[in-house]
């Protein structure tokens, strides 16, 4: 069982293919809630980090009808699934999905209006340094949204850290401190108390 759930970190093999499909519908409610905190700019250039099965990319393309969306994931299975899920938008030139590592984002400075990370920062190494990478590729004034299904305040959720190697569940306060240390400003914590959901938004300083 632990081996199967390891696919939440990096989907591989048949279990990984099943996991990315499950993620698309399983994470839909928390992702829908998280997207309510996004900036509204119809022509935004958006990056979804840890894009998984691609459902959030599709939702972002609807939210920004004149924009473009890029998905990045370090799992080849996730890249294939997200590409298939968004094949029409890719054919239209509105979407691109690439394999990569959040520790070295393959984009030029000041490139994206909005960057999102749904159910993924649990697995990011060197979080403060990775947040600096996110800051680098954001445009001045651009926003970064983190959305997690666990707000780090429920001890029962900690059991997943023992099941899934390399997983860390963060509180809103911990993420806020790391984001500010990386150079972000206007950091805000949003919670859905009944569900223990967490969303943190932050901005790159204006030039």
Question: Where on the chain are the PLM-derived regions?
Answer:
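Conserved alpha-helix/loop element of class I SAM-dependent methyltransferases that forms part
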Residues: 25-44, 59
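A short acidic, Gly/Pro-enriched loop at the edge of an enzyme's catalytic core
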Residues: 103-114
């Amino acid at each position: 069982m632990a081996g199967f759930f390891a696919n939440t970190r990096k989907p591989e093999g048949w279990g990984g293919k099943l996991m990315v499909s499950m993620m698309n519908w399983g994470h839909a409610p928390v992702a829908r809630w998280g997207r309510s905190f996004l900036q509204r700019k119809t022509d935004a250039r958006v990056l979804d980090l840890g894009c998984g099965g691609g459902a959030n990319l599709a939702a972002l393309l609807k939210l920004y009808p004149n924009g473009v969306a890029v998905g990045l994931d370090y799992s080849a299975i996730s890249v294939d699934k997200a590409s298939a899920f968004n094949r029409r938008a890719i054919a239209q030139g509105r979407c691109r999905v690439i394999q990569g590592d959040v520790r070295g984002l393959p984009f030029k400075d000041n490139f994206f209006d909005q960057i999102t990370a749904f159910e993924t920062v649990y697995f990011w190494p060197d979080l403060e340094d990775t947040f600096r990478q996110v800051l680098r590729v954001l445009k001045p004034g651009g926003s970064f949204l983190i959305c997690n299904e666990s707000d780090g305040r429920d001890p029962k959720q900690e059991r997943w850290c023992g099941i899934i190697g390399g997983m860390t569940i963060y509180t809103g306060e911990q993420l806020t401190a790391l984001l500010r240390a990386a150079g972000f400003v206007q950091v805000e914590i949003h919670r859905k108390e009944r569900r223990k959901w967490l969303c943190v938004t932050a901005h790159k300083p204006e030039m």
